[in-house]
Amino acid sequence: MVRHGRTTANAAGVLAGRLPNIHLDDAGIAQAVTVGRSLRSVPVTHLVASPLTRTVETAKLLAAELDRPVPLTKDKGVVECDYGDWSGKKLKRLSNEPLWSIVQSHPSSVTFPNGESMSGAQQRAVSSIRRWVQVAGKESGPNAIVVVVSHADVIK
């Protein structure tokens, strides 16, 4: 599992959630290239990414550094948690919300206002990753290696 590189939203302290067109910034581009280089000698057989812009950008930059071509597949199963009303808001502002302390101390118990529960996001992602492990095993055998590019809360 690889988290996407730093984005313009991360740098601005904004909870991006599933907002479209959130791009990597220069630091995020460098991070993605570095991860790709560190995986260069790993025989990756499958590359999967959340369909959001920042994860696709990360995956493409990472893939360009691998020692062989690996096709990229976008999978909604590993997309970011739907933060609902919190999406696009500054983290400083959100830290004043009563739900914030629960998000920090017991995230699996949280459902975001007009959004998704963290446990639901986790179940969705785990199911998707298990499916990819099975697919990769069938297509590439027991030595298959799947790299999934996703989001911090999904990876946690």
What does each of the following model-derived ranges do?
Residues 8, 54-56, 80-81, 154-156:
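Short, active-site-adjacent cap segments at secondary-structure transitions
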Residues 33-40, 122, 126-137:
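Generic structural signal for well-ordered alpha-helical scaffold segments
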Residues 44-51, 73-74, 139-149:
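Short glycine-rich phosphate-binding loop at a beta-alpha junction
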Residues 46, 99, 119, 136-139:
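Hydrophobic/basic alpha-helical segments enriched in Actinobacteria
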Residues 56, 127-156:
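Active-site-adjacent alpha-helix immediately C-terminal to a catalytic or transition-state-stabilizing loop
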